[in-house]
Amino acid sequence: MPSWIRAVILPLSGLLLTLPAAADVKARSCSEVRQAYGAKGFSLADIPYQEIAGEHLRICPQEYTCCTTEMEDKLSQQSKLEFENLVEETSHFVRTTFVSRHKKFDEFFRELLENAEKSLNDMFVRTYGMLYMQNSEVFQDLFTELKRYYTGGNVNLEEMLNDFWARLLERMFQLINPQYHFSEDYLECVSKYTDQLKPFGDVPRKLKIQVTRAFIAARTFVQGLTVGREVANRVSKVSPTPGCIRALMKMLYCPYCRGLPTVRPCNNYCLNVMKGCLANQADLDTEWNLFIDAMLLVAERLEGPFNIESVMDPIDVKISEAIMNMQENSMQVSAKVFQGCGQPKPAPALRSARSAPENFNTRFRPYNPEERPTTAAGTSLDRLVTDIKEKLKLSKKVWSALPYTICKDERVTAGTSNEEECWNGHSKARYLPEIMNDGLTNQINNPEVEVDITRPDTFIRQQIMALRVMTNKLKNAYNGNDVNFQDTSDESSGSGSGSGCMDDVCPTEFEFVTTEAPAVDPDRREEESSASKFSSSLISWSLVCMVLALQRLYR
């Protein structure tokens, strides 16, 4: 071939070869990416008009791209932000469930106590008048301690109720025996015989059982709602690892870099990314489900035998019945007290001229358990607990379900019906890898997210422990055992208020001065060695008191 022909053909062939490339460059314009990128609020100055070589990319495929280094960095941060918002949005239901139901239950309970105290005060003012008003602090202290217990105060319910009846006995004993003067020591002796004398009939024993188990259940339940609220709020605020952020960027915004801003991730691809990013949250699910089950058990108690509403509504009537029992048995009670504590000194003439008040004989209307009032919180306990139970059941398995819930969102993925025209991490095609199981240990072979299965998230483990502790307290409350929410360091305190003697097996015989007054600190226990010594000295002291009493009797 002549040289001049070769000189003409070769440039022409080179020109023809470049024509498809030029057409291809025009087809790979970044105009769609520019529009989508600008809609995110980013500056268009970052983005080229046409694809450029992608050797600078650190996350997306290093092919021809519409992304600069600055774009990849910004879109990486955007993917992190969107992921955090998605998790918080997806867990919104469980968070609002615990926040709103805790608020309702707390309002209901506090108002129930306020109404019960007001009802008792109104009834006793009408019935006993000045006598009640002069001794009203005994009843005010009862409700103050009940409120303090409910709010987490270190109150032993049994000790507190025993103290209430002992104080009431002291006041009543003076009122039915106005002809005598009683010293503080004598009244202290009187109070020691509350259990043995049963001056108030069987009301204190029954009320103690009802109040303790109802308050234990109610307080533990509201504490459970608090813990659930706090755990849900904390876990919903995720901090993705660097490996997770890379996977999120690759899934959500590498399509932009490939010039495919409208192509969304494949559903299964999304699941693997989310399971890797939320592996620790999924591990929370087991303990969370046990916690929800325990909450449901206590809720059943609140609906049934531990119903705080059925205990507090008629408490004024029950206490008034106890007072009438005391009035009816006043002579027998006084005789036994005089026998055990000695004959009191006569009162001055002016005071002894007064007789025992007649108005203790007033009878009250019987309480109708069918009268289930609603409070300003807007409901009765039955309806409130039923509503809470329904919401609790819906919150089970919420943490392991997060990846599925997020990946069902049409804003995130192409959906399960479009498995061919979706982004698989490299191109627009079907996603082939298998879906990982839930939990940290199952992510060892996750193809999308680098997960160190040997290093569980410390923060999530703390939430698991908080749930475990609360579940144990709920189980105790279900069985009627008290739980100390403030100070759990003293293991010698056992199960607190719920571990006392509340059944018919308790001693009921009247005894002379061999019963100690309630301890000031219910959590403090004497050592066994010192207890045995004290028991011996107490027996000796009892014998001395018996001799003195007999001498006085036959003098």
Curated annotation (Swiss-Prot):
Top-level taxon of origin: Eukaryota
Annotated signal sequence range: 1-23
Bias (Low complexity): 348-357
Key word Signal present: yes
UniProt KW keywords: Cell membrane, Glycoprotein, GPI-anchor, Heparan sulfate, Lipoprotein, Membrane, Proteoglycan, Secreted, Signal
Region (Disordered): 348-376, 480-501
Principal cellular location given in the protein's record: membrane
Gene Ontology terms: cellular component: extracellular region; Golgi lumen; plasma membrane; side of membrane; synapse
Membrane topology: Lipid-anchor; GPI-anchor
Subcellular location: Cell membrane
Propeptide feature ranges: 531-555
Tissue: In the cartilage growth-plate, gradient of expression with highest levels from the proliferative and pre-hypertrophic zones to lowest, if any, in the hypertrophic zones (at protein level).
Gene Ontology biological process terms, A to Z: cell migration; regulation of signal transduction
Lipidation (GPI-anchor amidated serine): S530
Family from the record: Belongs to the glypican family.
Known role: Cell surface proteoglycan that bears heparan sulfate. Putative cell surface coreceptor for growth factors, extracellular matrix proteins, proteases and anti-proteases. Enhances migration and invasion of cancer cells through WNT5A signaling.
Protein name, as recorded: Glypican-6
High-level lineage: Eukaryota, Metazoa, Chordata, Craniata, Vertebrata
